[in-house]
Amino acid sequence: LVNHTFRGTEGFSDGSAPADVGSRFEYYWEIYYMADGRLEAHYQRPASRVPHGPIEALGFVEFGKWRINDDGDVCQSIPSVGYGVELCYWVDRRGDRMAMYYTSCGAFNRCYVGRLGPEGEIVRGRAFTR
């Protein structure tokens, strides 16, 4: 992952719904993994521009941390995602495609160990599209 950008989509609160279900909401994310253990995350999620305003899909940019734990899982924390609690994943990489499966869920109540999390493409370098 070092010096690569992982980008794709993940379901929000209804993330376990199949892709063809009308209620499914997917949000985009792009994460660049730096060699020093920092990450830069560009992502979208439902939010309001003003207190008590309408909810819409808004874009965010944050910096967090990542590491490889003793089990070989990728663990990361992003301050405003899951209250900044570290999440860990088992990674399945096939060419330029990658899928991450939860091995620890932190503060996510829609998560369970083994559930598919982020899935998408991996690109060399800092390669944000949004």
Predicted regions and their residues:
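Lipid interaction determinants
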Residues: 1-65, 69-130
